Amino acid sequence: QIAGMIGAALGMADAGLEDGWSGRIVYFAVPAEEYVEIDYRLGLVRAGKTSFLAGKPELVKLGAFDDIDMAIMIHTGSADSLEGAAGVSASSNGFLAKTARFLGKAAHAGVAPEQGINALNAATLALSAIHAQRETFRDQDCVRVHPILTKAGDIVNIVPAEVRMETYVRARTAEAMLDAAAKVDRALHGAAIASGCTVEVETVPGFLPLANDA
């Protein structure tokens, strides 16, 4: 994205168009564009250091866009969906983010594993349960769910008592996004119950689906 912005600035400068402008153009790099490191950024929000998890809404809140009349965003895209060096995408998926914290019971994995409750087993079962939902996602809804484990235990000879997961739930429409999110929640809670663990699930609003109609 930064390279595209710089390229646009250089192109405007080379074309010598500045004399004909009645306003000004701002080449505006926005940090923290992606919703990543969700637990860390939620910590910043809870500490009062930020209000949002991504750069654009935070900058809107801070007034950085107050004197901007029109904004054009550039983003990298798939070569399959664009023709030439640049193009206008028909739509972009919306998404919401989820964090899951599985809580079990620590025990010595070699001496007394039966005394533990394995939170990693709950998390891996949840991953399988999420995967089992994929055939229920309609192709036209473009649903994408891609969880990761951000903490899977502490040391190898202790039954994991805490495991953390983050995931996006993406879809072409808000309805499909909420439907997929409900299935993910069901997988997370069902896996925890099956494993004897508890799970804390937090859902964080992301961005709404975007449909370019002009």
Residue spans of the language-model regions?
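Metal-dependent amide/peptide-bond hydrolase catalytic core
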Residues: 124-214
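Transmembrane helix-loop-helix
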Residues: 14-16
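Di-metal (Zn2+ and/or Mg2+/Mn2+) metal-binding site signature of metallo-dependent hydrolases
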Residues: 1-12
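Surface-exposed charge patches
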Residues: 10, 57, 186, 190
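Alpha-helix N-cap/helix-initiation motif
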Residues: 1, 112-116, 177
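Residue-level recognition of alpha-helix initiation/capping sites
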Residues: 3, 50, 182-183
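Bulky hydrophobic/aromatic packing residues
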Residues: 3-4, 22, 177, 214
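Histidine/acidic-residue-rich, glycine-tolerant segments that coordinate divalent metal ions
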Residues: 6, 19-146, 153-158
